[in-house]
Amino acid sequence: MTDSSHDGVPAPRRILLVTGLSGAGKSSILRILEDLGYEVIDNPPLGMMDEIVTRAEQPVAIGVDSRTRGFDAAAVLAALGRLRVNPDLQAELIYATAEESVLLRRYTATRRRHPLAMRGTVKEGIEAEIELTARLRAAADMVIDTSDLPPPELRQVVEMRFAPRHDRMAEGLTVALMSFAFPAGLPREADMVFDARFLRNPYYDPDLSVRNGLDQAVADYVASDPDYPRFLDQIDGMLGLVLPRFVREGKKYATIAIGCSGGRHRSVTLVEALARRLAAKNLAEPGGTCDSPGKPAHIEKGAAPTDVQSGGADAQGAWPIIVMHRELARQGRSSWRWASRPREHAADVVEGQYSS
């Protein structure tokens, strides 16, 4: 099982390293990936990772956490780095997390022992694991916060992001809008990248530096740049041209990335504004669905500004839209959310407990 290729060139084989906090849903993510056709290996010795990938003939999902023999964040990142230099592989790191209070509640409900709390409390084990895996969260390609995320929606976002092209649950195109920081590297999955570093930078305003683009004051500051409206219009116009062509090519998932210096102010503001535009166009389509900008489907901290700018709906279809802020997620300030939900769920999933 591989993703479809272009011009006869095989697509890189996907290798997913799934890590995170115990009780946050890592095992649930691995089960979903197994249903999608991935070869799943949970907690192999780190020294065997290269051999596992070499022998596998299909996409691989490898679970790695504090229970893994020889676990060390630096060793995991080194293994990931070795995989990424191989042009025949597309290696990505997924980090599952949840708020401490949620993890405590889950452990209380299941009466399971935390792997790092053999001689202490569950709370102490959670805190130790957060510290132990901090470098992995900071380097993750995708941080999934399951605090308020029902299992059916977890399945939905994993399927939309990681299913092979021919097996994606959405019939049409799913659009992911991502903010990121250029110094942290370009998002490997990005189909289009826009550079917002020429806009006014709130970082140099002491009152705004500690905030982010989800804050209305920061969004207003960025939007006050005289070139901001034109830049946003041109990105919107470019997507109006390109996204329908992606659909014609059979592409099922498109990642549009906007970057700035720190990934917290200008890029976040633009992604939020673009998400509102696309969601507003979805509402104009028959059967379109949109989450309220003031009530995101899932966001850890902060709320998107609520002004809505809408363009015409004739250039683009009513597509599911996911918003992800990579740097904010790595810092625990935000997670992914729907800006516009799929019209219907393709998977009939029963809600249940998360597995670590």
Swiss-Prot record:
<dbReference type="InterPro" id="IPR005337">
    <property type="entry name" value="RapZ-like"/>
</dbReference>
<dbReference type="Pfam" id="PF22740">
    <property type="entry name" value="PapZ_C"/>
</dbReference>
<feature type="region of interest" description="Disordered">
    <location>
        <begin position="285"/>
        <end position="313"/>
    </location>
</feature>
<feature type="binding site">
    <location>
        <begin position="65"/>
        <end position="68"/>
    </location>
    <ligand>
        <name>GTP</name>
    </ligand>
</feature>
<dbReference type="Pfam" id="PF03668">
    <property type="entry name" value="RapZ-like_N"/>
</dbReference>
<protein>
    <recommendedName>
        <fullName>Nucleotide-binding protein GDI1189/Gdia_1902</fullName>
    </recommendedName>
</protein>
<dbReference type="GO" id="GO:0005524">
    <property type="term" value="F:ATP binding"/>
</dbReference>
<dbReference type="InterPro" id="IPR053930">
    <property type="entry name" value="RapZ-like_N"/>
</dbReference>
<keyword id="KW-0342">GTP-binding</keyword>
<dbReference type="InterPro" id="IPR053931">
    <property type="entry name" value="RapZ_C"/>
</dbReference>
<feature type="binding site">
    <location>
        <begin position="20"/>
        <end position="27"/>
    </location>
    <ligand>
        <name>ATP</name>
    </ligand>
</feature>
<keyword id="KW-0067">ATP-binding</keyword>
<dbReference type="GO" id="GO:0005525">
    <property type="term" value="F:GTP binding"/>
</dbReference>
<keyword id="KW-0547">Nucleotide-binding</keyword>
<comment type="function">
    <text>Displays ATPase and GTPase activities.</text>
</comment>
<dbReference type="InterPro" id="IPR027417">
    <property type="entry name" value="P-loop_NTPase"/>
</dbReference>
<comment type="similarity">
    <text>Belongs to the RapZ-like family.</text>
</comment>
